[in-house]
Amino acid sequence: MFLEDMVEYQRDRVTFGVFQKLVVKLYKALVFNLSNKKEKLEWQLLLIADCLRIIGLCRLAYRMASKVHTSTSSVKNKFWSTHVSGMVLQYSGDMIGAEKAFLKSQEFACELSLSFSLQHLGKLNVEVGNYKLAEQQFIEALAIREKLKRADLVESTNRAIRGLQKLRT
């Protein structure tokens, strides 16, 4: 997939803010690396990988997330590295690989993280036209988010459900 196609495909947009965030995360990664704060460094690397995904540097983003996954001992970073890998694969058009990564991430998920995995699986299933499964995944994510009283995330999931309903009409 060419860079222009990838950028068109993404819901996230390349803006100055993305580059600004990337520079800040690179700086923080350097600071955490120099101060031997491994888990914080890994987290910054995942945020950097997400910025790289948005910019369209998906191979680099995938390698970075995979490297964190293989080197971390943090369950949280295992989840997020696998989840970021799934997002990168989805945004580069590898829906099968993305689905596998999102499902794999659930092995490392706490309840809240599981809701992110379910919501992203739902988005993936909307994109491939599997609306019934997408709706089930959105409803599961919504139930978790309501139970945890995460109003900001509940709204995000409700927006996804409304978008799916709009597609069906």
Whereabouts are the PLM-identified features?
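Eukaryotic all-alpha helical interaction scaffolds
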Residues: 29-33, 52, 65, 69-72, ...
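Structural signature of alpha-solenoid helical repeat junctions
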Residues: 40, 77, 113, 153-156
